[in-house]
Curated annotation (Swiss-Prot):
Keywords: Coiled coil, Cytoplasm, mRNA processing, mRNA splicing, mRNA transport, Nucleus, Phosphoprotein, RNA-binding, Transport. It comes from the Eukaryota. The lineage of its organism: Eukaryota, Metazoa, Chordata, Craniata, Vertebrata. The keyword tRNA processing does not apply. Component of the THO subcomplex, which is composed of THOC1, THOC2, THOC3, THOC5, THOC6 and THOC7. The THO subcomplex interacts with DDX39B to form the THO-DDX39B complex which multimerizes into a 28-subunit tetrameric assembly. Component of the transcription/export (TREX) complex at least composed of ALYREF/THOC4, DDX39B, SARNP/CIP29, CHTOP and the THO subcomplex; in the complex interacts with THOC1, THOC3, THOC5, THOC7 and DDX39B. TREX seems to have a dynamic structure involving ATP-dependent remodeling. Interacts with POLDIP3 and ZC3H11A. Residues 293-339, 896-965, 1464-1491 form a coiled coil. Residues 1416-1425 have a biased composition (Polar residues). This is THO complex subunit 2. The modification Phosphothreonine is found at residues 1385, 1443. Pfam families: Tho2, Thoc2, THOC2_N.
Amino acid sequence: MAAATVVLPVEWIKNWEKSGRGEFLHLCRILSENKNHDSSTYRDFQQALYELSYHVIKGNLKHEQASNVLNDISEFREDMPSILADVFCILDIETNCLEEKSKRDYFTQLVLACLYLVSDTVLKERLDPETLESLGLIKQSQQFNQKSVKIKTKLFYKQQKFNLLREENEGYAKLIAELGQDLSGNITSDLILENIKSLIGCFNLDPNRVLDVILEVFECRPEHDDFFISLLESYMSMCEPQTLCHILGFKFKFYQEPNGETPSSLYRVAAVLLQFNLIDLDDLYVHLLPADNCIMDEHKREIVEAKQIVRKLTMVVLSSEKIDEREKEKEKEEEKVEKPPDNQKLGLLEALLKIGDWQHAQNIMDQMPPYYAASHKLIALAICKLIHITIEPLYRRVGVPKGAKGSPVNALQNKRAPKQAESFEDLRRDVFNMFCYLGPHLSHDPILFAKVVRIGKSFMKEFQSDGSKQEDKEKTEVILSCLLSITDQVLLPSLSLMDCNACMSEELWGMFKTFPYQHRYRLYGQWKNETYNSHPLLVKVKAQTIDRAKYIMKRLTKENVKPSGRQIGKLSHSNPTILFDYILSQIQKYDNLITPVVDSLKYLTSLNYDVLAYCIIEALANPEKERMKHDDTTISSWLQSLASFCGAVFRKYPIDLAGLLQYVANQLKAGKSFDLLILKEVVQKMAGIEITEEMTMEQLEAMTGGEQLKAEGGYFGQIRNTKKSSQRLKDALLDHDLALPLCLLMAQQRNGVIFQEGGEKHLKLVGKLYDQCHDTLVQFGGFLASNLSTEDYIKRVPSIDVLCNEFHTPHDAAFFLSRPMYAHHISSKYDELKKSEKGSKQQHKVHKYITSCEMVMAPVHEAVVSLHVSKVWDDISPQFYATFWSLTMYDLAVPHTSYEREVNKLKVQMKAIDDNQEMPPNKKKKEKERCTALQDKLLEEEKKQMEHVQRVLQRLKLEKDNWLLAKSTKNETITKFLQLCIFPRCIFSAIDAVYCARFVELVHQQKTPNFSTLLCYDRVFSDIIYTVASCTENEASRYGRFLCCMLETVTRWHSDRATYEKECGNYPGFLTILRATGFDGGNKADQLDYENFRHVVHKWHYKLTKASVHCLETGEYTHIRNILIVLTKILPWYPKVLNLGQALERRVHKICQEEKEKRPDLYALAMGYFGQLKSRKSYMIPENEFHHKDPPPRNAAASVQNGPGGGPSSSAIGSASKSDESSTEETDKSRERSQCGVKAVNKASSATLKGNSSNGNSSSNSSKTVKENDKEKGKEKEKEKKEKTPATTPEARILGKDGKEKPKEERPNKDEKARETKERTPKSDKEKEKFKKEEKVKDEKFKTTVPNVESKSTQEKEREKEPSRERDIAKEMKSKENVKGGEKTPVSGSLKSPVPRSDIAEPEREQKRRKIDTHPSPSHSSTVKDSLIELKESSAKLYLNHTPPSLSKSKEREMDKKDLDKSRERSREREKKDEKDRKERKRDHSNNDREVPPDLTKRRKEENGTMGVSKHKSESPCESPYPNEKDKEKNKSKSSGKEKGGDSFKSEKMDKISSGGKKLFSLNLSSTHKSSDKHR
């Protein structure tokens, strides 16, 4: 077939005689083998003849040669003459058009040479008349044309003249009679056809008219389809194929009048003819109306009208008149519905569907817009009926419910109809396709809807239980895909168009619940967001649903929940997605709708509840909604409303939770923690587990009991009926394996909130998100612990080392998750051991319990070793670590009070039921039974917990000796204990906070070796600033609870000597290191006595005050908020001392004033605390009642032997000194001992002078004295700043086990001894003056050389000042009430200055001025106040040695009066000296300013402005323990304008506050700071 394209190569023509002729003949022989006219070889044969002839015309070949070869070829084919005639016809046309004479001549010669091959008749048919004339076949072409016209006219246009009145009428009558006879016998179509032919011939009937008559009779006799089809097939074999189609078209056109209506019989005939392929659809389609473009225009018009309706419905109507207008428009539109014009295409389509010709019906629908045909009810019903018939066998097999019969559907008798489906695989053949064309209009046939859904349900059951081969699985997956498509395109849209059919909704849920939620939610998403835009009817339905939803929601209130709920339910059956979308949008705006909406949803179907869950998730995931408010510090209200709605609706109704839980998990995976609010609400509502920091102590106590007590007394709301909802939540978590992943994600996200999200968000928001994440973790973990069985829990939660090392779970969270597992496991092991030996004694039971604990906890002890570096286990044992983290409050104590309280409540409730006369007897009986059962449960639970606690305590008693190892110092042990145990857990939850405090107490009560209770408490109370500052809001609340419980224990011991002696007297936790008597440097252990413990407690209270004041003064939001929260929590036990309480009150009042406009939330917190603090003022006591101050022994031997301070306990808690004390320190001691007494006397008289001159009763010269004293106070404040250096802080000592400490830390203790010894040596006035001048020169040297020594000397002077202040305060409080404050602080004993004050006034100023020069050390600012107080107290005690023990009040007043007179005289003399000293003070002040850090200086300038001169105005040490606090007070004192009275009162306050707490011991605080840095 190489010649297919170029049939006759040019080379053949050139070599014609040699080879070309033979090649051509061979080619023609090959091409002649296929005789079919439709084949390509036939066309190639024609092409070969044409090319041969064309070469002749061109002159390349002679016509004789061509005629000869054509003659040879004629033998190959019978149709050779016809083919050659066709070739000549084409060449005739071409040569005529070319008008080239040579070619025309060659053509004529060729035709003449071939006349013997082609007959004249054939040539006359195909050649042009002019060509025929030139060939001589006709005489004249003109005459030939005229003759042909006449013949054609006669044949085609001239009508035959019949005798219509006789022959034809009779013929048609006989024809109709022939066709209308009874066809049930042996009459066949062939016989009838022969008779018809006879009639046509006899009566000369028109064959076309006969065909028309046959079709008419066919219309009237539809039951004889087979007969007429056979007849028509036979008849049409004699006619043109198009004739039948034209006649039918003519019939359809007859009815295309404006009011014409095409009969259904004609549609049916046309459909049957199409089905049997007697006519072609394309031929008939052109005869039908309306045209396709008209149909498309109509479809577009419907869409536009639907959108207009939507726009009208969504318009805002402002008046009732417009409402009336809208209603009238609706009525007009309903009246406007006219009879639609006759659509012949749809009529034919309906007929095709009725007879089961799906292929032709499908072709017609393809010509139309989507769902246009099915939107006509008759078409939709016809498709539905065809589907009914097709699925009948399959439905009967798998879909009919048990016990139901149903009416069978008869199959079509037509063999050409679609085959019925016998299996699910058969559905793919036609049924799914039919549904796709039906679309949302399945709504017209609810029965078919139910059938399809039931078949789908059966398929899903088979699909889920199928364990067949891979090939079958692939087939079923294809069917599943088709089923999901049908659900998306047909079932859900059809449900939308149904008129609120709740049964269909429930039926559909029967299939939907077999789908995974991923499939369901995808279908809901398509339904909500895409389906309603696919069809005009659905567009209208959506608008109407929204309009109706608006109407209902506007009228929904708590009072009409029931009727409104019915309306919502009715509306939701068909269009739940649209309805819920609108309802949720309203809930997000108005949270007061949540309760009525939740109550009104009780009429929904199961499918609607599932759709509601999807709509909630979609609303939560809305990317257009901001999750934060505009201030970027709080979560948006819409999210909070949705969360609240979620919790309520999921608890009340049986909604699948899987999707929501997975959504939260996915959000956590993506590092987003906002949506944890949803989980928190769901768990709270469904499981009844509340997480709140506002729990009362009664609730907190109830939470330490069993599950029943927790439910009854542990929550704010009475949580009931949560059994079913919590079971649903548990099942959802376990079925989808989300329990552990959610826990781990939350635990990891806590850090993610800070380190991933924290940088972009406001600190306040980060704290809230952290709290939310943490609280939800605690709540969720609590739910799992109380609801999961032991097997479920152990199976899902891995071991502690896997949690921490592989899943990177923080240790506190990991133990929180593992703790219930340990408890469950121990309990189950214990039960197993008990069952093995029944009836054993209590001791055996305890032994079995301990054995079970060892079995369970031994692997844990090994696992925890990998959690920390090996050095940690030198301080605490893994057993102790695991024990601490594995126990709970339930294990340590039984809340008897809570059990008793709840039982009493039930008794009262039962009495109220008995007294209620209106309650029906049955209900009364039922309620009493419920209360009795609950009471029995509580009592049984209490008994069970008591036994459990006893077993746990026995276990701990056996374990305690191995808890704390003696490999390192007690200080390091306590550091690790606080860092790894107490601090992480005390801020984990409120119950854990209580647990930590109780555990410390328990370890103390167990007399645990190597555990220093005193040091532990000291480390907790000494410096809380860093801990408080690093807490979130809820953590601060928990930390406050922890401190409150610790303070409660301390207060109990402090308040009663007997209690202290009983609980602490002989306990190793209160064992201290005493410095040995004499100077041999040895140490020995001794117990801390009661009075010294009271001093310690006062020091702790003071430390708390100082830390609180610091936080309040920082101005930082978190510092202020957290300390206010902590202070509120510890309010029952702190402050107890009046002066500390007053200092706090002033600071909080200042916060109230400053934050009122700036930060309202801080203002609210401060006001709340301020009010509570004032209400507790009556419970506060003076300092001397809080801790007793005993006078020291007078003899020097006693003071040397017992240490500074006079009492034997003064060094009881001091840190043990090393044996190799340096000789330099001994020299300092001996030098200072000889000078101390005189300084104390001088200081006392000076302070008395200050007190008298600041009373406001002195002469005119006293005002100068007041100013002078104010300046001295300013210097004193400066000195306090300078004293804050690590090397010279008196509190910087350690209560160590072995007495090992650094020399730098010992130094202040030795200096203290030396100073207090020196104070016992009296000197004369002249010696004093001389000594002070020498001291001044020495100080100048020390300022430039040795800062530590300088700091030490300033401390000495500070100590010397205090006794006189204390005495002055006592005098003044006895003489009269202070005008400004009116606060009384009694002091023990009465003091009088035995020395004239004029001699000591000048040296006192010198000392104060030198204090200013010391350098401040901010890093240890938290300890300075303690050192001041302790120095002052010890010097006060020394001064008591030189004063008479008792003086009458009258004598005291006389001596005070004399002192006052003398001081007035001396004041004039001092004025002269003041001028001389002022220059030196200015220079000292400027030096001090240079030493202040730059940022502090800048802040001073900003705060004070031009008031830098009045630097002397400050308050008590408690009020301003930090450098910047003094400057803050300057503005306050300046603006008050009360310099005289106010400042003197402040100095008194300062003396009052600083006079407490003897320097009997000092705990190591520098190490505390270091360790606190570590553990925080």
